Amino acid sequence: MSEKMRRIVEAAGGIVWRWKAGSDIANDPATASSKSAQEQLDSIEVCIVHRPKYDDWSWPKGKLEQNETHRHAAVREIGEETGSPVKLGPYLCEVEYPLSEEGKKTRHSHDCTADTKHTLYWMAQPISADDAEHLLDAFGPVHRADVGEINDIVWVSVREARKILSHSTDKDTLAVFVDRVQEGGATAQNLLIVRHAKAESRKSWKGTDANRPITPKGAAMAFALNRELACFNPTRLATSPWLRCQETLQVLSWQTERPMEHINALTEDAFAEHPAVSWLAFREQITQTLNSRETTAICMHRPVIGGMYDHLRGLCARKQLAKQLIAKSPYMPTGTAMSLFIIDTPQGPSIIDIQKVSPIVY
């Protein structure tokens, strides 16, 4: 008789946080980066939900739906359980424990034979109702959880959260959150590097390279990528003016009613002729992202991305982050993105988190 196969239930969620009302930072968020990590932590509130089925307090989270990524599930589940539309921030951690221990105060993750729940967590921030409305078509609907699933939510300090959380694994995740804040996670701004979707081959295309379009398969990839980009609430869209880059972000621009800024210095020809000028144009987008505190998505070409990576690796806070910016062509697959979280330091921009963003095409 064959052994029973282990079942893994995939889930996702996050620690939703905000600046405490009345705090200096809440009154002027631009001052956050000038505060110490402890001052930031003292000014932060996190959201905890109560599950009547288990009579416990935990982070908002839930199971993945069919054809859904972890990041999309995290944003959707947080919205369903808290009523707050959010955008994702730096990644936190993964937690795994036997399903039989769901709802128990202490969880043990060492049993590799039992049916298991595997959950990924992010930092997440509430967004405005207006931003949520702009994202609706790209992200999809979010329906509030039934009172039988979640019957209470509270916003508490980090110190209070340690006392209220029911589970050891949730307290461990809170410790990771504190570490993230200490390295700048609460002031990090998000820049998404998008590689255009699959385009017609140079060999078969009879027009100019600037007018070479994406393929029908590429269009499907671009459409699916919109759902993933929406998880980060990109309110600024920028692109090389060449057609394949425009087409990759075009539907997202239409869905969110956000205009696309064309950056001539980010075309393949411009980069080949003046790579330093291309970097200065990209560097200006980093500055604008930090100053505006808005998420920016920039669509570019393979060789341009490789050139930008050469500079960005030097901005990474850790060597293992720099290794995620591949030094060998093609650098990243077509129709995907890299999500960079950047903080402003006296020495200049510093990248503290990098996430690969890939769509599910079905």
Residue ranges and their predicted role:
Residues 183, 283-348:
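Active-site-adjacent alpha-helix immediately C-terminal to a catalytic or transition-state-stabilizing loop
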Residues 36-87, 205-212:
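Conserved Nudix-box catalytic region and its N-terminal flanking loop in Nudix hydrolases
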Residues 96-139:
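Active-site-adjacent beta-strand/loop module that shapes the phosphate/pyrophosphate-binding cleft
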